[in-house]
Amino acid sequence: MVSESTEAPTPAPGSVREHWNELAEDVRQHQFRYYVRDAPIISDGEFDALLGELNDLENQYPDLRTPDSPTQLVGGGFATDFASADHLERMLSLDNVFATDELRTWISRVEQETGPDLHYLCEVKIDGVALNLVYENGRLVRAATRGDGRTGEEVTLNARTIDDIPEKLTGTDKYPIPALLEVRGEVFFRLEDFAALNAALVEEGKAPFANPRNSAAGSLRQKNPAVTARRRLGMICHGLGRSEGFEPASQYDAYTALAAWGLPVSTHTVRVTGADAVVDRVQYWGEHRHDVEHEIDGLVVKVDETSLQRRLGSTSRAPRWAIAYKYPPEEATTKLLDIRVNVGRTGRVTPFAYMEPVTVAGSTVSLATLHNGSEVKRKGVLIGDTVVLRKAGDVIPEVLGPVVDARTGDEYEFVMPANCPECDTPLAPAKEGDADIRCPNQQYCPAQLRERVFHVAGRGAFDIEVLGYEAATSLLEAKAIGDEGDLFSLTEDDLLKTTLFRTKAGGLSANGRRLLDNLDSAKDKPLWRVLVALSIRHVGPTAARALAGEFGSLDRIRESSVEELAAVDGVGGTIAAAVAEWFGVDWHRQIVDKWSAAGVRMEDERDESIPRNLEGLSIVVTGSLETFSRDQAKEAILVRGGKAAGSVSKKTAFVVAGESPGSKHDKAVELGVPVLDEDGFRRLLEGGPDAVTDSGV
């Protein structure tokens, strides 16, 4: 491998950090809409460009790369309604290439490290939902979705309804059943089963699903397993996590064993040698992608030998020994019936295309974002046009432009509204030169209210189950709450005003009781979650933790000057100004006062039994730890006065390395930074730096 420079990285200038904060927030919002809301507003291609820009900034200025950066989290780090389940080993994502030249470059880089003429597995990339199965002594004990790669949603009962997933493995003389087996795969709809499901829904007078992937995700997450059972989902296994008593020499051998035990594996997987053979498979499936029983959106290429996989290792989000070749997006034409607008949480007004439904890449599409008024003009689309629609990455629809020759003269230009469609407030850019226009009625605009109430329940905020988007809308429409400030004062009588939380007999539903219980439990969440829940611009979990750790109470944060706030490590001028500006608004302070009066804890109670033995030390945690989640490790460092940093530099005191630590471990060794294993981390927490002078991995 090429060694990295030993020079300390240049810290990001304030203007760059401000741009990174805004860009990271945009990416988080798009991840949230995609992974949690199932309502993306930009194409895959546009999202990849945003994420790529963010990654480029972090490569140039490593101090920007924090553990909760969107570049470091698989699946965005969001949770939904099911119980959390930790994976035994991380479920990583895959890096993508979009051209054969890029694929050959990747193969060349791999073979420079390992030697030439490697065996590669070529597997069709299923457009479905990742699922993690755990078998103990051959019996299925847990199934969980990918989630953030470390923790997913437990869906064991639902998984047991899928015919492809065996409850009990069948051993053979050649392949005895291991004591522990963690296996990963993709849940999907076979196209004929998806068509049958939609036909049945239409016959019942219900709306059909838009595409197989979304319907697979929704079907797997049903609260009633009987509904999942009726949906005829399928699964194919494509990887391993942790195992005991099973050490395959290659990925191909692993698949052979999985099949022998009764687990489903793809019949389309082929083992080849060299770059030319890999490219041949890419071209073959590019021409035959519609010949498969399920949707595919690319080809996954993996180094076959397990020892070489270990040698190549992984980054924080993807293995270095595998790559996904994504096929070019597919296109179709349809009629643009109207252009409508949507108002988001920050007041941004986004136009979207309302079209005649058209099938593209196996999905029925009728909506697509147009981003802003300038973009509508740039694309040159008119209402009534025949437009070219592309499914970027086979997932998100994008309007490319009009078919000008198809115009009849009846088409007309779209004009961005002058007033908010939700509250009729005049719209304007937040600052001169902005392409986006916004609704400035932040306090009362119904659209912004819904989004803020929903945000309070997010995983990065109070993490309140039951309070989903539908619940937020119902509470506001029934006037059970006036704004997010009323949430923690909700009573049973308030919930009975809504149809959502009221039984047919007129009593409080089980979900209503759960909501009240969850709200009550949330009152004791740590201060940093309160800060995130307040929807202060630029304040995500990292900045919130830094502020909470420094000041300890919301009153102290509220009373601090911009200079005092900016002096906090990990905050800076932009965030400090946003915090001070937020607390300068009367109705913002009223929200805080309402929460405080309702019993929400506004300060962190310091446990005097925990020593401040890491005061001023910068500590980086990388890889997967057995007894600490990433949040727990951060919390353990912060409460002892340390800084949980996201990148390694000469100022780093220690690097804690779990399984698959990636480049941060290499950087620490290169810079001479002490590296601790998990036992060393425990000693550090208990006794401070002196306790680990001679520790390491």
From Swiss-Prot:
Cited Gene3D superfamilies: 5' to 3' exonuclease, C-terminal subdomain (1.10.150.20), 6.20.10.30, BRCT domain (3.40.50.10190), DNA ligase/mRNA capping enzyme (3.30.470.30), Helix hairpin bin (1.10.287.610), Nucleic acid-binding proteins (2.40.50.140)
InterPro entries reported in the protein's UniProt record: BRCT_dom, BRCT_dom_sf, DisA/LigA_HHH, DNA_ligase, DNA_ligase_AS, DNA_ligase_CS, DNAligase_adenylation, DNAligase_N
Limits of the BRCT domain: 609-697
Biological-process GO terms, alphabetical: DNA repair; DNA replication
EC annotation from Swiss-Prot or TrEMBL: 6.5.1.2
Keyword terms of this UniProt record: DNA damage, DNA repair, DNA replication, Ligase, Magnesium, Manganese, Metal-binding, NAD, Zinc
Cofactor(s) of this protein: Mg(2+); Mn(2+)
UniProt-annotated catalytic positions: K125 (n6-amp-lysine intermediate)
One Pfam assignment: DNA_ligase_aden
Protein purpose: DNA ligase that catalyzes the formation of phosphodiester linkages between 5'-phosphoryl and 3'-hydroxyl groups in double-stranded DNA using NAD as a coenzyme and as the energy source for the reaction. It is essential for DNA replication and repair of damaged DNA.
Protein name, entry field: DNA ligase
